[in-house]
Amino acid sequence: MKYLLLIIHVLLFGIVNAQNDNVGIGTVTPDASAILDVSSTDKGVLVPRLNTIQRMGVANPSDGLLVFDTDYGCFFFYQNASSSWLSLCNQA
């Protein structure tokens, strides 16, 4: 019985401890300051692509939400302080 409790304790500790780690894709040593560290020498990151109607239709967007608007060919992020989508291209 003690052995079973020890195994359960070790497994639960591992699960709880894993929740505090960061994730590395393409790297075995993710940067400690990042929750997600993506590394590649020949690929990029593809963020969600929406047209303007889809972007404006996002229900309750989170502060800092990033999308690529295919109508403008530009990145937009949502800012709660202004309750609006802000362009990163200064064209919209």
Question: Which residues does each PLM region occupy?
Answer:
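Sec-dependent N-terminal signal peptides
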Residues: 3-13
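Sec/Tat signal peptide C-region and signal peptidase I cleavage site
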Residues: 14-18
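C-terminal trimerization/auto-chaperone modules of long, extracellular attachment fibers and adhesins
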Residues: 3, 19-92
